[in-house]
Amino acid sequence: MKILHVCSELYPLLKTGGLADVLGALPQAQNQIGLDARVLLPAYPAITAGIQNTQVVAEFDNFAGHVVLRYGEYNDVGIYLIDAPHLYGREGNPYHDAYYNDYGDNYKRFALLGWVGAELATGLDNWWRAEVVHAHDWHAGLCAAYLFNKGKPAKSVFTIHNLAYQGQFSYHHLYEIGLPTGMFHVEGLELFGQISYLKSGLFYSDASTAVSPTYAQEITTPEFAYGLQGLLSGLKAQGRLVGILNGVDENIWHPNVDQYIPHHYKLKYMAGKKKNKAELQAYFNLPQDESALAFVMVTRLTEQKGVDLLIESADEIVKQGGQLMILGSGAPHLEQGIRELAAQYPENIAVKIGYDEALSHLMVAGGDVILVPSRFEPCGLTQLYGLQYGTLPLVRKTGGLADTVVDSASESIKARTATGFVFENATPEALRHCLQRAFALWQKPRAWTMVRTDAMEQDFSWRKAAEQYRTLYERL
């Protein structure tokens, strides 16, 4: 079965969020189970720098100007690149300029991405024709509309990585992107008087997926749906909206092969974890105390990630003699709040503002508990890394966090299903109580080791996700 993934980011060449991680791993996993998956991307400078050996597949002029379609390979996956320098030849972020202003021609840049995705299902490449066009997030949302307008020559799937970004543009652009005005309708592209690329993906695709079963349920409610609850709850009722969890790329995130950590370890030989903890404490200039419960947090510093909840309850960690290490950047007032905590409690709390890939790996490997107290989290990857590394996730019960972490209540510990700590209400009090429960378990080393073992035995491989997507494709 020939699958074309249409997207705007690819790890490690270009990444602004978790979308890139998915596209860096899922197509490869699908090829390993016998599918024929390829990826279509705009030829951004960062992408072309990493995929230099390409051949021309097609050359044409359309509503977006002169376009060359190229083909190359990256990590054993076939990659199509849309070479249109007037649209994509911009350094840095793919969506906005250095001042965070969205590019004024984004409507055209991402319409072209969708258009080429549909054309690859109708013979644009003489040697390969997509049978399923799998579009990701709003950037690729018009794929399904172009396919619909062509009489649906291929099956279409649309994956929502984050519903908060919708790709809305003025309706008059419809004349510039080659779609009939009849599609601008509440039963079509229209949302609040504008064209919505995200709604296009949902409305016209044969099936839509969200990146976790709980998030697929949450987005049918007004709180999470951004005005699309009617459409989304309808799709859910028809069985056209399902949740499939993201996986972990075990070539990059596994404690026995991780290239960024000084000491490798695995379930049967855990000595390396203690050594990584000592290295981590030394990096952050905290006391190298093996008995101190070490909490780590690697995140964007935003309210969505629950950082404000942690700021208000972090004194509990200090009171109980624990340590807290934070890596991230984001809202200035939260950066300031974290810095003030570290200044107030220099023996217990340390922070690095910014992002550091190598340090993030050491934190996951060296910590005892990884904090993910998000207000909402479509899937979440850091808690999956925590499970993989035996760093117990402490999470709020939402989205993918609810699907992947089982609370260490006494009955679940006995049943060998517990893998971390879970709290429900997005309040500092609820988080504080959860921190207290983590300290209580830490006082019982045998029980802690048991939960850690069960956490590390969880399977969140991309192979598992690839099989679930194959089942979905076959159902269409």
Swiss-Prot record:
Coiled coil: none annotated. Keywords: Glycogen biosynthesis, Glycosyltransferase, Transferase. ADP-alpha-D-glucose binds at K15. One of its GO terms (biological process) is glycogen biosynthetic process. It catalyses: [(1->4)-alpha-D-glucosyl](n) + ADP-alpha-D-glucose = [(1->4)-alpha-D-glucosyl](n+1) + ADP + H(+). It is an enzyme of class 2 (transferase). It comes from the Bacteria. Its EC number is 2.4.1.21. Pathway: Glycan biosynthesis; glycogen biosynthesis. GO terms for molecular function: alpha-1,4-glucan glucosyltransferase (ADP-glucose donor) activity; alpha-1,4-glucan glucosyltransferase (UDP-glucose donor) activity. SUPFAM superfamilies: UDP-Glycosyltransferase/glycogen phosphorylase. GO terms for cellular component: cytosol. InterPro entries: Glyco_trans_1, GS/SS, Starch_synth_cat_dom. The keyword Cytoplasm does not apply. NCBIfam families: glgA, PRK00654.1-2. Belongs to the glycosyltransferase 1 family. Bacterial/plant glycogen synthase subfamily. Synthesizes alpha-1,4-glucan chains using ADP-glucose. This is Glycogen synthase. The lineage of its organism: Bacteria, Pseudomonadati, Pseudomonadota, Gammaproteobacteria, Pasteurellales. The gene is glgA.
